[in-house]
Amino acid sequence: MKGCSSYLMYSFGGLLSLWILLVSSTNQCTVRYNVADCSHLKLTHIPDDLPSNITVLNLTHNQLRRLPPTNFTRYSQLAILDAGFNSISKLEPELCQILPLLKVLNLQHNELSQISDQTFVFCTNLTELDLMSNSIHKIKSNPFKNQKNLIKLDLSHNGLSSTKLGTGVQLENLQELLLAKNKILALRSEELEFLGNSSLRKLDLSSNPLKEFSPGCFQTIGKLFALLLNNAQLNPHLTEKLCWELSNTSIQNLSLANNQLLATSESTFSGLKWTNLTQLDLSYNNLHDVGNGSFSYLPSLRYLSLEYNNIQRLSPRSFYGLSNLRYLSLKRAFTKQSVSLASHPNIDDFSFQWLKYLEYLNMDDNNIPSTKSNTFTGLVSLKYLSLSKTFTSLQTLTNETFVSLAHSPLLTLNLTKNHISKIANGTFSWLGQLRILDLGLNEIEQKLSGQEWRGLRNIFEIYLSYNKYLQLSTSSFALVPSLQRLMLRRVALKNVDISPSPFRPLRNLTILDLSNNNIANINEDLLEGLENLEILDFQHNNLARLWKRANPGGPVNFLKGLSHLHILNLESNGLDEIPVGVFKNLFELKSINLGLNNLNKLEPFIFDDQTSLRSLNLQKNLITSVEKDVFGPPFQNLNSLDMRFNPFDCTCESISWFVNWINQTHTNISELSTHYLCNTPHHYYGFPLKLFDTSSCKDSAPFELLFIISTSMLLVFILVVLLIHIEGWRISFYWNVSVHRILGFKEIDTQAEQFEYTAYIIHAHKDRDWVWEHFSPMEEQDQSLKFCLEERDFEAGVLGLEAIVNSIKRSRKIIFVITHHLLKDPLCRRFKVHHAVQQAIEQNLDSIILIFLQNIPDYKLNHALCLRRGMFKSHCILNWPVQKERINAFHHKLQVALGSRNSAH
């Protein structure tokens, strides 16, 4: 016994140790949706306890030196294996043999130095192979010959001196070949012959010290759509040579960023004449001279980036030939400002005249003095123009500033950060289709008469935030009734309290920002007519006096009529009162921000109409009490609540309801444990609100409600019981009558046997008068009923006992008329009852009906007749009623019993 116990303890200890080992090993990796993440775990070997059905395994940033094929036998379903950022120096060919479904293999940032013919011989299903940042200096033989499905191959940041990756045509499905940051000096046709049947979407040779492009080097590639040669330090001569080598190829995208291409001429891109080049990136080249006709051979170009250059001048023929250009970026493309005015960049009139299909023009962050009368002439398709921080001398916008855009269908104009101080009347009269006008972050200080916006008949948004000073008038926005968004944040706004309101014409306005203006005086009709307003930002003003009861004329309800308001921000307004009815009829409010005010006691029912509220912010106020009368309605559908940093009074009267709500709600309450603290009473100071014990709170309201509900339920129950006791039989009678009038009395009997009598009646001799008196009329009323009565239906000349047996067999049912006489009748007790029961037992049928004319206890019934009420279904047990009015109900129940099916037990 002792040995057995020791063995069990040893086994249990071993299993426990194994379980701990498995859990600790598995728990290091995160497994989710067949993806195992084992990165950053300092692993030195492949985990062997992961689920066998994983399809993705991440082993990056560990200390692996090898990928032993046998360790992957368990994971034969792997499709993606990422082993980057390890110390792997050799890859065994059998790895892909073990992983036949492998499609993506990432080995970047390892220590691979050479690749043999056998390395990837079994990796026939690979679509992506990443060998970036290894120590591969030379590719020998044909290591990628079997990779017929490979789409992307990354060999960037190695030590390769040649583009030759094999002999003979291979990699037929390759689309991306990345060879950036190697030591390739020349592109030779014989070294690119292996790509003879490839259609390269992208060939990246960036950051290589290229010095030579041999004749036909790109012609040997099947198809080449995109070539990246960024940071290759190509001089103008090499660039021109490159373009000639790309002639008659499929090239569409050419990136030559950061190549110190100081100047371009008509011959620079002439070799691209016989291509369909659509994208050209010349950014970061310190380009200072764009010669006339530089792009004349690029009629298919749609995207041109000249960002971050040092262009001194654009002439009328600088963009000649770009008849299909859609996107042009000149962000920070011009010479930066210096002391000498002569060094300012110059854009001649009609410089953009050839760009008739240009839709997007970005000229941000330049130092152009200002616009001229024909600066943008010819841009007849321009829709987006960004001029942020573009001009140095555009302090005043006049009706001549944008005259060159008169024929442009401009939709968006960005003029931020240009030191604009004044907008003259009719400045934008040329821009009838403009939708968005951004004048923010300037130095505008003026009174808005409304004529500034003349001609903006389709304007959707005007952004004027972060300017110096704006004074409104009643007609400030009278000419832009289509306006839907108006931003006036931090503009030292004046004259807001005039009547009629400056915003009255803006019937379509949905967003209005008046924040950070120190507004103290407004009228009740400030927002009159803005029925479509959805967002109102009024934070960081000084509205405290306007909502005080002591305010002359009473509180100012400037929110009335905003029936579609969704978001209201009144943060930091010094509010210490909220008048009753100020939020009335604002049924669609989803978010209210009243944070950083001085609110303390809130009136009951002020939020009653805010049952759709999703977010409520009351942080950093002086709220001590959170009561149901105030916060019950808005808390119903709340998703987010912020009441941090309030001095809560932790008493039953003040916060018991709030604490109960907190402990039951799913609403997001950030920093509940740390920033919802009790302030009073003293012994609760600093105590977390959610830990306040409400069990001792004696709130009578719930008990009153419980008393009312329980009392009502008890009264209803008593009434129902009395009704059933007094009139239950009548209810049952009418119910049964209704049911059987619809469905009929007889149930479907599946037995094929036919009976001559509906029922054989067993009764005592002394009860024969009662039987004849009540069963005979039933036969007369219902012709389908026929009872077997001894005095009438026994065959003449047949012995009595034999007649009884025959009659019972020919009857569908057997009725017992039970009285004290029956219990004493010797014939019934000895023969009739026993034979009837025996037949019922033999046939296994519910064919017996008991009619009690007298109240006979069950034990007497059992003793005399060997019967009990529990042997029969309830509808087969009938009691003769004392009251005459219940006789009809009795007859109905008897008909139901007679019509019931003789179902087997």
Swiss-Prot record:
Species name: Mus musculus (Mouse)
Q: Which residues lie on this side of the membrane: Cytoplasmic?
A: 727-905
| Free-text comment about domains | ds-RNA binding is mediated by LRR 1 to 3, and LRR 17 to 18.
Q: Name one GO molecular function term.
A: transmembrane signaling receptor activity
- What name is this protein filed under? Toll-like receptor 3
**What residues does the TIR domain cover?**
755-898
Q: Which PANTHER family match?
A: TOLL-LIKE RECEPTOR (PTHR24365), TOLL-LIKE RECEPTOR 3 (PTHR24365:SF524)
Q: Where does the UniProt entry place glycosylation sites?
A: 53, 58, 71, 125, 197, 248, 253, 276, 292, 399, 414, 425, 508, 663, 668
Per the record, membrane topology reads:
Single-pass type I membrane protein
UniProt cross-references to PROSITE patterns, sorted A to Z: LRR, TIR
Chain ranges of the LRRNT domain: 26-52
Tell me the first and last residues of the signal peptide: 1-25
